[in-house]
């Protein structure tokens, strides 16, 4: 099992992740990408995972350049068309624990390699109070920013399913952005409607592409819903 926090330079890994995911044989490896959307533990520097117009230490918001220029890197979807014979790919959000646990169980049971991208709040880098972490995480999916979906590759053919978060709710999206200090320059001293609309537009473009992929490569039952009785889970043994 590999833990990956930064994915803008996958070639920095000692064993290349893309090489493992491309292997045809049985390969029981799970990569978990905890996506905090920047190089957080080294100083909140911008990365490929940073969303548009977010302020970081290497791309601070100013009068001329309002934060990051460019879109957030899509990590999960391209792997579905990587040519691998068997893969399990998914996005998760801890604000939806049943979905997260169900996907992690499926990933660990997969005969092939698995890659799970987790929405990972960082109160220091995102500039918000600690007690708002779960609220913000839930808003991320509810507003359409962080959709929850799965790609199961069998014999090289991807099959898409989703749980929620593909439809944009503009009011919730604005609330989501406003809840974090990394976007405060979009609201103060003036309301930067053009930049906010661009973030929503880029996100909607991505979600529309996902909808088309689900339509073209979707399962017979495209909605993925996990029912987990957490009371029946065995207690963890810590040694």
Say what each PLM segment does.
Residues 48-110:
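Conserved thiamine diphosphate
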Residues 93-130, 134-136:
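ATP/pyrophosphate-binding catalytic subdomain of soluble kinases
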Residues 120-239:
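Flexible, low-complexity linker and terminal segments
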Residues 27, 85, 142-146:
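Structural alpha-beta junctions
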Residues 27-32, 37, 77, 86-90, ...:
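Structural motif
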Residues 1-46, 95-102, 107:
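Thiamine diphosphate
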Residues 15-19, 46-51, 130-135:
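Short secondary-structure boundary/capping segments
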């Amino acid at each position: 099992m590999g833990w990956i926090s930064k994915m803008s330079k996958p070639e920095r890994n000692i064993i290349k992740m893309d090489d493992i995911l491309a292997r045809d044989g049985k390969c029981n490896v799970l990569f978990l990408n905890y996506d905090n959307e920047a190089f957080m533990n080294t100083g909140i520097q911008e990365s490929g995972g940073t969303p548009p117009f977010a302020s970081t230490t290497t791309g601070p918001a100013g009068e001329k350049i309002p934060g990051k220029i460019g879109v957030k890197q899509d990590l999960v979807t391209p792997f579905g068309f990587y040519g691998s014979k068997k893969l399990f790919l998914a996005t998760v959000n801890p604000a939806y624990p049943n979905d997260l646990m169900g996907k992690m169980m499926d990933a660990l049971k997969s005969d092939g390699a698995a890659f799970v991208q987790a929405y990972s709040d960082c109160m220091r880098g995102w500039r918000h109070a600690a007690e708002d972490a779960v609220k913000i995480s839930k808003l991320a999916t509810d507003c359409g920013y962080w959709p929850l979906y799965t790609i199961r590759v069998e014999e090289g053919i991807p099959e898409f399913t989703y749980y929620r978060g593909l439809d944009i709710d503009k009011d919730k999206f604005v609330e989501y952005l406003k809840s974090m200090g990394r976007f405060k320059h979009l609201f103060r001293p003036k309301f930067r409607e053009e930049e906010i609309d661009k973030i929503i537009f880029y996100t909607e473009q991505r979600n529309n592409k996902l909808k088309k992929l689900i339509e073209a490569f979707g399962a017979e039952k495209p909605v993925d819903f996990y029912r987990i009785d957490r009371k029946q889970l065995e207690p963890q043994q810590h040694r």
